[in-house]
């Protein structure tokens, strides 16, 4: 059975909806007067970059201000103390022949490699620790010498001039390093082998032939 809607009910529903709509659209205050919208002012916040009067000092910068050199100048690398230390290393003493430089580097490596092999080798708790450690250090010297020779063959061609720069970073002329040639690198590799084996023999002689009292067995 269909139900008919009375006119009174429709008027009540329409008046209720209109009153709700008016309440949502125009809210009223406590005094039943409609609230007025207070005009607001839009504030804009602007940030401006101000250039400093003096340029900031960069701690790390390219050497001589040239980024194409491919090296950076830092407070450590540009320190006179660090420069003095590096210039006194055997590999950077260009006034010394490559053969003597290789002997000096090899002596240091051979002498100091014996101790770790003796104390940390597989035969460290046996009576053969000294001999086994010395032979292992000598074997490592041979391997390093072969690697140095392979690097020289792959990097330098026989008869070509030195690949080292003939100018310093400040533009001063200098004699090219003879180590950066095929002949110079061959002498350095031979000197490293001779010095390394000599260092191993000298360390074994001091530890087990002279039996120095300060050596802790």
UniProtKB/Swiss-Prot annotation:
Which topology term describes how it sits in the membrane? Multi-pass membrane protein
Q: Which residues lie on this side of the membrane: Stromal?
A: 49-135, 211-217
Q: Which InterPro entries would you find in this protein's record?
A: PSI_PsaL, PSI_PsaL_sf, PSI_suXI
Q: Does Membrane appear among the keywords?
A: yes
- Keywords for this protein: Chloroplast, Membrane, Photosynthesis, Photosystem I, Plastid, Thylakoid, Transit peptide, Transmembrane, Transmembrane helix
Q: What is this protein called?
A: Photosystem I reaction center subunit XI, chloroplastic
Span of the signal peptide = none
Give the UniProt family note: Belongs to the PsaL family.
**Transit peptide start and end:** 1-48
Q: GO biological process annotations for this chain's record? A: photosynthesis
Subcellular location per UniProt equals: Plastid, Chloroplast thylakoid membrane
Q: List the disulfide bonds.
A: none
Q: Which residues lie on this side of the membrane: Lumenal?
A: 157-189
Residues passing through the membrane, by range: 136-156, 190-210
Stored Gene3D superfamilies: Photosystem I PsaL, reaction centre subunit XI (1.20.1240.10)
Mention any one GO cellular component term assigned to this protein in its UniProt record.
chloroplast thylakoid membrane
Q: Which organism is it from?
A: Cucumis sativus (Cucumber)
């Amino acid at each position: 059975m269909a139900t008919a809607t009375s006119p009174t009910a429709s008027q009540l529903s329409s008046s209720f909806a209109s009153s709700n709509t008016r309440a949502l659209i125009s809210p009223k205050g406590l005094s039943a007067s409609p609230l007025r919208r207070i005009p607001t002012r839009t504030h804009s916040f602007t940030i401006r970059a101000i250039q400093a009067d003096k340029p900031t000092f960069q701690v790390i910068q390219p050497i001589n201000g040239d980024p194409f050199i491919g090296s950076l100048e830092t407070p450590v690398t540009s320190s006179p103390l660090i420069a003095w230390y590096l210039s006194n290393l055997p590999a950077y003493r260009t006034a010394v022949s490559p053969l003597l430089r290789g002997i000096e580097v090899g002596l240091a490596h051979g002498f100091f490699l014996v101790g770790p092999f003796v104390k940390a080798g597989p035969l460290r708790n046996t009576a053969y620790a000294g001999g086994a450690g010395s032979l292992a250090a000598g074997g490592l010297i041979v391997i390093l010498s072969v690697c140095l020779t392979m690097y020289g063959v792959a990097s330098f061609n026989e008869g070509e001039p030195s690949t080292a720069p003939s100018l310093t970073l400040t533009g001063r002329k200098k004699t090219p390093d003879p180590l950066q040639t095929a002949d110079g690198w061959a002498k350095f590799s031979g000197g490293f082998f001779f010095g390394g084996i000599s260092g191993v023999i000298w360390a074994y002689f001091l530890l087990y032939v002279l039996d120095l009292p300060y050596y802790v067995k």
